[in-house]
Curated annotation (Swiss-Prot):
Tissue/organ expression: Expressed mainly in body wall muscles and ventral cord motoneurons.
Gene Ontology biological process terms in this record: regulation of transcription by RNA polymerase II
A Pfam family recorded for this sequence: zf-C2H2
Annotated GO CC locations: nuclear speck; nucleus
Compartmental location: Nucleus; Nucleus speckle
Ranges annotated as biased composition (Polar residues): 351-360, 370-379
Protein name: Zinc finger protein syd-9
Chief location category: nucleus
Composition skew (Low complexity), residue ranges: 142-158
Protein species of origin: Caenorhabditis elegans
A molecular function GO annotation: RNA polymerase II transcription regulatory region sequence-specific DNA binding
Residue ranges covered by zinc fingers (C2H2-type): 20-43, 65-87, 93-116, 387-410
Lineage: Eukaryota, Metazoa, Ecdysozoa, Nematoda, Chromadorea
Keyword Zinc attached: yes
């Protein structure tokens, strides 16, 4: 033996040919494994394996684990545990794809790799996150520049992370929401660039108080074809970001009248509240009549609907008396007529006037609660009117929202609620005497029938009681008859069995009597037969000597 002294490995005893000889036979082996296999194959006696625990056993066999059933020795406890399944016929390793069971784990692994490799790869892909590393940065020299420096360009590909399907399914809802929000943002930016009127509606001042009271539905803007590549949208938006106008410049009604420019805009539109010129109720009615006439002439409007809307949208007379304008009723009428004509021309020429499900104007899409009664089947409806608050200039889509906004934001009294109209009962028709007499006669006949039925009720109950008692008597008599019939049947059965027994006994007695009589007469006949036999035999003996005598020569 020699000891390996290596600085990297623990000192171990090297096996030589002298120590690898079998203790039971003169064979020698080059390795411990071959010696163990030889002993398991040819020397499986338990006593021999136990002898290996002695001090003269070869190195590597001093800690052998022996099977209690067959006596085989193993170097490791795990090998012995696997071997014990041979004697118990247990197959604990079951294939999850086909249900085949195996005794060893290695056999199950081989089976899966051979028959279920595709399913195993799919199962592994569900739980793994595959991360592909980015390639190394490649630098390129473009030559020296005028400053003497050498510019370098680096190209690096970002790492790609492939999330497994299990994680994708768990986060699918959040990803869908995020993608939907991104698509909405991109669609909004594209519409702002292509449609300048979109900002007029989309960038209007919000009404937080009204939105808390009156529930409004948030509708997405016009659906446009979503581009396939986000990079194209970014390239389209990038050069136009610096040129786009601000929301304040796009809004025609300024929010704050503190500056001179904003005040001049309000004065030009007739919304300056500091002047002294006012309109009374008669002048306002005249302006309304003129507007009705011009609206009825325009081809894209409906006279009845717009007149009702205008009357509903107009503030009360006391509030109108406090409104002051610079241009008077002529300025106000001209402004409204110009707005109406512009909306009519836009409905004829622009593609936004087409009232389709996905291609209508932004104003109609942004106001889903607009009155559908103004739309007709033959002509395209005009866009809904945008009302404004006289105190803060806030745009309001519906006329019913304006009183609520004025009440909640500016302290105006709430609008009067119309009292419910009570419906008067219809006048009763005069009653005819003959019909009343007929009805009374029918009622009296019905009462007489009820009394007759009540009088006949006791008799019916008495008849039912009598019938019930008779039925009870019949049941008892029927039960008695059945019992008597059963008794007769039992008697007949007993008589039949007695007659049969008597017949059998008589037959047996007669046969016995006959045999006895025959036996009583039988002793005379045997004696006669014996006597006749003796006589026949004696006669035959006497005849034989006479024959011999006749045949003799003398």
């Amino acid at each position: 033996m020699s000891v390996c002294v290596s600085p990297l490995v623990q000192a171990t005893i090297l096996m030589t040919e002298e120590s690898l000889t079998c203790p039971q036979c003169p064979k020698s082996f080059s390795s411990t494994k071959l010696l163990q296999q030889h002993q398991q194959m040819f020397h499986t006696d338990k006593s021999v394996l136990l002898s290996l625990k002695s001090t003269d056993a070869p190195v590597g066999m001093d800690r052998a684990f022996i099977c209690e059933t067959c006596g085989k020795a193993f170097r490791f406890r795990s090998n012995l545990a696997e071997h014990r399944s041979v004697h118990t016929a247990l197959k604990p390793y079951v294939c999850k794809f086909c249900g085949k069971s195996s005794r060893l784990k290695g056999n199950l692994t081989k089976h899966i790799l051979k028959h279920h490799k595709k399913e195993q790869n799919e199962a592994i892909a569900k739980d793994d996150i595959i991360v592909k590393k980015a390639p190394k940065i490649v630098t390129k020299d473009n030559g020296p520049t005028t400053n003497g420096s050498t510019p370098t360009t680096s190209t690096a590909t970002p790492s790609v992370i492939t999330v497994s399907s299990a994680l994708a399914s768990s986060n699918g809802h959040n990803n869908n929401n995020n993608n939907h929000a991104v698509n909405n943002n991109l669609r909004t930016i594209k519409m702002e660039l292509e449609d300048p009127d979109y900002n007029l509606i989309a960038k209007s001042a919000p009404t937080p108080v009204v939105s808390k009271i009156v529930a409004t539905h948030t509708v997405t803007p016009r659906s446009r074809p979503t581009p396939k590549d986000i990079k194209e949208i970014l390239e389209t938006i990038a050069p136009s970001v610096g040129v786009s106008e601000t929301p304040e410049e796009m809004c025609l009604l300024p929010k704050d009248a503190s500056s001179e420019s904003d005040r001049s805009v309000l004065i030009s539109l007739g919304f300056d509240f500091g002047s002294t010129l006012s309109l009374n109720h008669q002048q306002l009615q005249q302006v309304v009549r003129e507007l009705k006439g011009e609206l009825s002439i325009s081809p894209d409007t409906v006279q009845s609907d717009h007149s009702d809307d205008f009357e509903q949208d107009s503030p009360p007379p006391m509030a109108i008396a406090n409104i002051s304008t610079v241009g008077g009723e002529a300025t106000l009428a001209a402004m409204i007529v110009a707005a109406t004509n512009a909306s009519g021309q836009r409905g004829d020429g622009t593609p936004d006037s087409t009232d389709t499900q996905k291609g209508c104007s932004p104003q109609r899409e942004l106001s889903p609660e607009s009155d559908p009664s103004t739309s007709s089947g033959d002509s395209c409806p005009s866009p809904p009117k945008m009302l404004h608050c006289k105190e803060c200039g806030t745009l309001v889509r519906k006329s019913s929202h304006l009183p609520i906004h004025m009440t909640m934001s500016h302290g105006y009294p709430p609008p009067l609620v119309a009292a419910p109209v009570e419906e008067k009962p219809a006048p009763e028709q005069p009653v005819n005497a003959s019909s009343l007499h007929n009805e009374l006669r029918v009622i009296s006949n019905a009462i007489c029938e009820l009394k007759a039925q009540q009088a006949a009720t006791p008799r019916v109950e008495q008849a039912l009681t009598y019938i019930d008692s008779r039925v009870g008597k019949l049941e008892r008599s029927l039960e008695t008859a059945l019992n008597s019939i059963y008794t007769l049947v039992q008697l007949q059965t007993g008589m039949t069995s007695s007659v049969n027994r008597l017949r059998e006994d008589s037959t047996k007695n007669f046969s016995d009597l006959k045999t006895r009589m025959e036996m009583s007469l039988s002793p005379i006949k045997p004696f006669q037969q014996r006597f006749s036999r003796e006589r026949s035999s004696s006669s035959s003996v006497e005849r034989s000597p006479s024959r011999e005598r006749s045949r003799s020569p003398l």
